[in-house]
């Protein structure tokens, strides 16, 4: 099983292994598929007949990965209706990373914290300022 899913124009259809409710309108979608990515990278998420959008990788390991979404529009409302066992298309990871060698202060708010969670995990001594 390759860790780099697909960097072509064709999304790889993956089954949702778990859905975690993170708040009133936020959910994390987990996939039993390895993901090698660096802090700040994202995947393209494709919902057939709806659209394709970039989503930051919120969690990754040698066995699984996840992204977190907040329902605020047509695409994310459709995503919110998906359940464990449903499939969607994934391409990536894409994007540039950040240096994790120096100390850093990470500032995030609301669901935006999920987009920097891999950076926080990679930093040796992070200071995190979080607001709702």
Question: At which residue positions do the language-model features occur?
Answer:
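FNR/FR-type flavoprotein reductase catalytic core
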Residues: 74-132
């Amino acid at each position: 099983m390759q860790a780099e899913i697909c960097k072509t124009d064709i999304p790889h259809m993956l089954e949702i292994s778990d859905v975690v409710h993170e708040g009133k309108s936020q959910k994390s979608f987990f996939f039993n598929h390895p993901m090698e990515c660096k802090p700040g990278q994202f995947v393209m998420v494709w919902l057939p007949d709806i659209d394709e959008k970039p989503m930051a990788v919120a969690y990754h390991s040698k066995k699984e990965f996840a992204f977190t979404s907040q329902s605020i529009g047509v695409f994310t409302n459709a995503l919110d209706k998906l359940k464990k066992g449903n499939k969607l298309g994934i391409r990536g990871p894409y994007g540039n990373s950040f240096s994790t060698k120096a100390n850093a202060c990470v500032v995030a708010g609301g669901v935006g914290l999920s987009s920097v969670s891999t950076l926080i995990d990679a930093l040796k001594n992070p200071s995190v300022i979080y607001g709702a």
